[in-house]
Amino acid sequence: YNETGDVKYVNPMGDKFTLYWEDLLTLRRRGGLPGHAEMEGKTLFFKYNTGPSGHGAAPAAGQAFALKYSVASNTRVFAMEGEGGLTTGVSHEARIAAYGLGLGNLIYVVDWNDYGIDDRPFSDIKAGSPKDWFEPYGWKVAGTENGEDWESILTAYDELFESENKNQPKALWLKTRKGRGYDKFDNASHGAPHKRNSKEFWNI
């Protein structure tokens, strides 16, 4: 708003609820932005709290259900999750419910990178691949081994809609490397910022 004067950029709730670039400097500091965004203060625009793995499964299915059976039935709901979040009970229940309710407007985007915050990779704990994790639930599944390439991603995305069953929920998996472009890889990249004003800090 300060640069353009366009009122569409003004938050009607005032500065207390307006997010500025400077607020990013308060990330994970007392009274600042939380590491996992929550529906309060300057991040009140989020529809749901974030945090525990798999936490968003039920809200995503619920949102897709509400939209499908309202005047916004053509609106798609995208849920982003890593493979760790697919291990929770609520995730299994949401996948079953999505198929049973015919939520063809629900699309999971699975970041398949094999790591969470622990040293042990998920492949040591959770067997199989995204096809194994979704197809038995009746979902349409497509993906790419090159999850950082937009052309590959879009090709896989288009495959999801080749299904004749318009009520079939969909899962798009992307094979990635956690920490790519950040120079801290796998579990070591979690909650580990580069030292402020270091060479790595400015290179990113």
Q: Where in this protein do the model-derived segments appear?
A:
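Short secondary-structure boundary/capping segments
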Residues: 2-6, 93-97, 122-127, 160, ...
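Structured core elements
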Residues: 107-109, 143, 171-173
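Cofactor-binding active-site loop characterized by glycine-rich and histidine/acidic residues
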Residues: 1-101
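Acidic, glycine-rich active-site loops and adjacent beta-strand->loop/helix elements
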Residues: 81-88, 111-116, 147-150, 176-178
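Short catalytic-loop micro-motif centered on adjacent basic/acidic residues
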Residues: 79-81, 140-145
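Hydrophobic, small-residue-rich alpha-helical packing segments that form membrane-like cores
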Residues: 56-80, 89-114, 123-136, 154-167
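Catalytic cores of large soluble enzymes that bind and process phosphate-bearing ligands
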Residues: 12-19, 45-55, 86, 118-126, ...
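Glycine/aspartate-rich loop-and-adjacent alpha/beta segment that forms the canonical ThDP
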Residues: 132-135, 150, 154-204
